Amino acid sequence: MAISTELKAEIVKDYQRAEGDTGSPEVQVALLTARINDLTPHFKANTKDHHSRRGLLKMVSRRRKLLDYLKRTDAEAYRALITRLGLRK
């Protein structure tokens, strides 16, 4: 269920602003998106797993808050990130 260390390191490398950057909103949103996408098939197979669904909803909410922050502080980076992650249609 959890994303592998290698995948996490690759995501951090792809979205970091500078070398060693793991805390920027772009990196955090990309990691949350990977975890959310990893959990989605689980809920298609296990529709009654409400305990894990709550965790998923918390992750979605946290990602939404980070995206709102990024949009408020750096709109250009926000647009680039949602395009790159494919979050908006």
Curated annotation (Swiss-Prot):
A GO term for molecular function: structural constituent of ribosome
Superkingdom field: Bacteria
Xref: Pfam families: Ribosomal_S15
GO biological process: translation
Entry GO terms, CC: cytosolic small ribosomal subunit
Keywords, comma-separated and alphabetical: Ribonucleoprotein, Ribosomal protein, RNA-binding, rRNA-binding
Gene3D superfamilies documented for this protein: 6.10.250.3130, S15/NS1, RNA-binding (1.10.287.10)
Family statement drawn from the similarity comment of this UniProt entry: Belongs to the universal ribosomal protein uS15 family.
Known role: One of the primary rRNA binding proteins, it binds directly to 16S rRNA where it helps nucleate assembly of the platform of the 30S subunit by binding and bridging several RNA helices of the 16S rRNA. Forms an intersubunit bridge (bridge B4) with the 23S rRNA of the 50S subunit in the ribosome.
Quaternary structure and interacting proteins, as annotated: Part of the 30S ribosomal subunit. Forms a bridge to the 50S subunit in the 70S ribosome, contacting the 23S rRNA.
Protein name: Small ribosomal subunit protein uS15
Annotated source species: Laribacter hongkongensis (strain HLHK9)
